[in-house]
Amino acid sequence: MVHWTDFERSTIKDIFAKIDYDCVGPAAFARCLIVYPWTQRYFGNFGNLFNAAAIIGNPNVAKHGITIMHGLERGVKNLDHLTETYEELSVLHSEKLHVDPDNFKLISDCLTIVVASRLGKAFTGEVQAALQKFLAVVVFSLGKQYH
């Protein structure tokens, strides 16, 4: 079980209360697909992913980015039970979708960059540490079903 300080709990909740999922989610997911193009192989049904402009303007990318944010919101609401919270998603991604679990870390890194750009000076080292701790536990939880 992960130990969360009061500061970490409040910071994580505050970050997710402040950010606009409809902007941050699509931006983070698009960044992941652009920076790490091999991640595109899981999204062949998304249509045009041929270049950065196409990815950024793709409504399927935007929709999935928002879905990711709502998935993370579930974790924010269940900080003490993240492994259980993400058990079904872990099974889905490992057994049905066969997603490389390293991709979860890639999207978390992209999300950190986008959140930092949105929060500006408020994204201090302490805030970053809390967010990255949360994302690391989510990544671990999503990878739990992989053998």
From Swiss-Prot:
Transmembrane segments: none annotated. Red blood cells. GO terms for biological process: hydrogen peroxide catabolic process. Residues 3-147 form the Globin domain. GO terms for molecular function: haptoglobin binding; heme binding; metal ion binding; organic acid binding; oxygen binding; oxygen carrier activity; peroxidase activity. GO terms for cellular component: blood microparticle; haptoglobin-hemoglobin complex; hemoglobin complex. InterPro entries: Globin (IPR000971), Globin-like_sf (IPR009050), Globin/Proto (IPR012292), Hemoglobin_b (IPR002337), Hemoglobin_oxygen_transport (IPR050056). Signal peptide: none annotated. It comes from the Eukaryota. This fish has two hemoglobins: Hb1 (major) and Hb2. Hb1 has low oxygen affinity, it displays a pronounced Bohr effect, which is enhanced by ATP, and a pronounced Root effect. This is Hemoglobin subunit beta-1. It comes from Liparis tunicatus (Kelp snailfish).
